[in-house]
Amino acid sequence: MDGLIFIVPMRNLQALEFLKHLNSIVKKQYPGILLIAQEDGLWPQLTDSVENDHLGFDYKWSGGWTKDLLSYLEAEPLDRRNYYDQLTLSMMYAYSEHYVLTLGKRDVGTLKEFLEKLPGSSRQKDAQLRAAYGYLMLHPGVKMTAPDGDVGPEMRAYLHDLNELYRNHPALYAMDGNSDGFEWIQFTSYDENVVAFLRKTEKQEETILAVCNFSPVSYDSYRVGVPFAGKYKEIFNSDSEKFGGQGVVNARAKAAVHMECDNREFSLKLKLPAYGVAVFGCTPEKGEVKKSSVKKGNVKKTAGKSRGKRMDKAKMTVVEKSVAVKDAVKVVKRVASRRKGASGDE
């Protein structure tokens, strides 16, 4: 679509009007149809309505998200800390459009080709494949997956249960277009290669805690900050033996303790599998005062007291938060430079 919109060095205004008119007509004739744009020119607000003088697409294909995730996963585990920003960059623009996220054949090749790109043994490759699809389903945005016919029984069971997890928990989709539906817990754990975040609805008891470990190191007692006192029960784990994993799971519910971590008043210790994704349902303690999902206003930046290079940026969600803009620009430039270098090598 880039060539249609742009005529260097000017915008193709006639093409823009054509797309607006075309999308309006299609929507009137076929109300249930989905219009998805694939565009790499950073054209703004593709998914805003024609009534607001924009193009009126329903979704935009997030090729950048797929490319960044693959670049991160293809790196050797010991080198992934240098690519960690590519794992988290997407949340800096996640709410600028309505995005479709995909790990389909056209993006990553067949499952066999995808596995060949990943480092490690056969078992480690399988674990990373599960972690990649887990991160896809937990990340904000509409999902589109189309694995090829080479899917084995364990991976088929995994994808089935992952889809059931998504369908049965509104926090994973109800507020996809609202930044209040997402909150970082850990996103500066460069050395550990772990990300942790919350998916939320307006109901506190529907909160989901997701912890993703993209390193080959498993943990028996990994501490993570949590939003409130209460019980945290594991509802999904990519390392379940059912899926061909090692069985590093959290069989019992965890009670949050009053110990600061990740700039949260409460925290808990959990088992975290290597190359694994663990998902927890949250039950607030009785009498727990319901707090705002995301505090409004500026978020102070202070030096973190917890592991690695964590900083007090855990409450940041999108680039709309003014305190994040400078950091976001630095990350975008670094990742863009890395993408350009990778393209030059091809």
Which stretches of residues belong to each language-model region?
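Conserved alpha/beta catalytic core and glycan-binding cleft of carbohydrate-active enzymes
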Residues: D2-T145, R167-V224, F228-D239, Q246-G247
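Carbohydrate-interacting/catalytic domains
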Residues: D126, M137-K340, G344-E346
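Accessible peptide chain termini
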Residues: M1-D2, E285
